[in-house]
């Protein structure tokens, strides 16, 4: 293997000092030591190692006079070479790990009676809570008169027939003209 050397020239100016002196000394020594060898000007090169069979194939394709590239041979290499048997396909498709697993964690919601997963809020009950919360937020927005005007006090929701207690003094009170839902606790 022939010795190779790469000389770098910095595009930015080097500050005067020990770094510049070392750099200039290195360049001078390299130029002196390599000046006795006759070589073409240095340029980046690409070396590719490949099997010898590819060179033989390249010589064979010259006879075809077609415009072909090495990428043409890569695409057919990735194609399947043998057909899978029906037994293998069935085993692959009907793999026990791919079958739908039976859920044993399904329970009945005690509030509404719909099916739900254990330790998860029922979807129907969640929808009721979301709708009630949306109505309360709309009422609060109408009282404030716009965004960014909310007072910095705690908000309390009172339904029909409820009165604020002594500890609720100083809180912002939102009154709803309907009966309190059973799932909406007062605390």
Swiss-Prot record:
Any GO BP annotation: translation
InterPro entries xref list: Mitoribosomal_protein_bL32 (IPR051991), Ribosomal_bL32 (IPR002677), Ribosomal_zn-bd (IPR011332)
Post-translation changes: MRPL32 precursor is processed by the m-AAA protease (composed of AFG3L2 and SPG7), which cleaves the N-terminal transit peptide. Cleavage by the m-AAA protease takes place prior to assembly into the large subunit, an essential step for mitochondrial ribosome (mitoribosome) assembly. Proper processing by the m-AAA protease is dependent on the zinc-binding region within the tightly folded C-terminal domain of MRPL32: zinc-dependent folding halts degradation initiated from the N-terminus and triggers the release of mature MRPL32.
GO molecular function (one): metal ion binding
Keyword tags: Metal-binding, Mitochondrion, Ribonucleoprotein, Ribosomal protein, Transit peptide, Zinc
Taxonomic superkingdom: Eukaryota
Entry binding sites for Zn(2+): 109, 112, 122, 125
Cellular compartment(s): Mitochondrion
GO cellular component, one term: cytosol
Assembly description: Component of the mitochondrial ribosome large subunit (39S) which comprises a 16S rRNA and about 50 distinct proteins.
Family listed: Belongs to the bacterial ribosomal protein bL32 family.
Function: Component of the mitochondrial large ribosomal subunit (mt-LSU). The mitochondrial ribosome (mitoribosome) is a large ribonucleoprotein complex responsible for the synthesis of proteins inside mitochondria.
Protein name in UniProt: Large ribosomal subunit protein bL32m
Organism of derivation: Mus musculus (Mouse)
Species classification: Eukaryota, Metazoa, Chordata, Craniata, Vertebrata
């Amino acid at each position: 293997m022939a010795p190779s050397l790469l000389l770098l020239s910095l595009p930015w100016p080097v500050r005067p000092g020990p770094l510049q002196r070392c750099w200039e000394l290195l360049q001078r020594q390299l130029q002196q030591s390599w000046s006795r060898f006759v070589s073409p000007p240095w340029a980046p090169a690409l070396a590719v190692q490949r099997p010898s069979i590819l060179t033989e194939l390249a010589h064979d394709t010259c006879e075809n006079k077609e415009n072909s590239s090495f990428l043409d041979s890569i695409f057919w290499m990735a194609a399947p070479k043998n057909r899978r048997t029906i037994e293998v396909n069935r085993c692959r498709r009907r793999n026990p790990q791919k079958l739908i697993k039976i859920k044993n964690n399904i329970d009945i919601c005690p509030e509404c009676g719909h099916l739900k997963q254990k330790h998860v809020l029922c979807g129907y009950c969640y929808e009721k809570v979301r709708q009630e919360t949306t109505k309360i937020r709309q009422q609060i927005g109408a009282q404030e008169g716009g965004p960014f005007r909310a007072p910095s006090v705690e908000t309390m929701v009172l339904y029909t027939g409820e009165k604020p207690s002594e500890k609720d003094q100083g809180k912002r009170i939102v009154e709803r003209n309907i009966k309190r839902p059973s799932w909406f606790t007062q605390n």
